[in-house]
């Protein structure tokens, strides 16, 4: 075997090894909307935590607000995803009135687009507990509308415990391997 043959063999092994690693990668998609920055903060910290804790994953963040702002068309998801939804409602108390979603409706439109609803593992709701019955009400409404579960909830920007809880749920849904 010549020196050139040996180098070609190394390149082939490296190429095959990288293809093998790509095949094992699991794509995790986090679909969300953030208006005040709270949900953006949570999803960004969740992505970092997932990448630190689990092997062979690629975490994709899809911010619906950016799609709408840039005039991009909705698209069909090719893989399962988890939706994150803050609560914005018209006044009221969430029982007798004040249960009409405002500002976050593009998330519902995205989920309803094509076959996206069937690919959604579920929704993680966020809000402010000061609003009592309205806390995460939109996530509960989406659960009823689309037939998927409310996986978890967090208040405001969420705490590390919330990140860990949601990460554990995602790890189970995607069958992830810890590092």
What are these regions (language model features)?
Residues 2, 9-104:
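N-terminal beta1-alpha1-beta2 submodule of the flavodoxin-like/Rossmannoid cofactor-binding fold
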Residues 7, 11, 24, 169, ...:
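Short amphipathic alpha-helical "recognition" segments used for binding
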Residues 77-179:
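FMN-binding flavodoxin-like domain, especially the glycine-rich phosphate-binding loop
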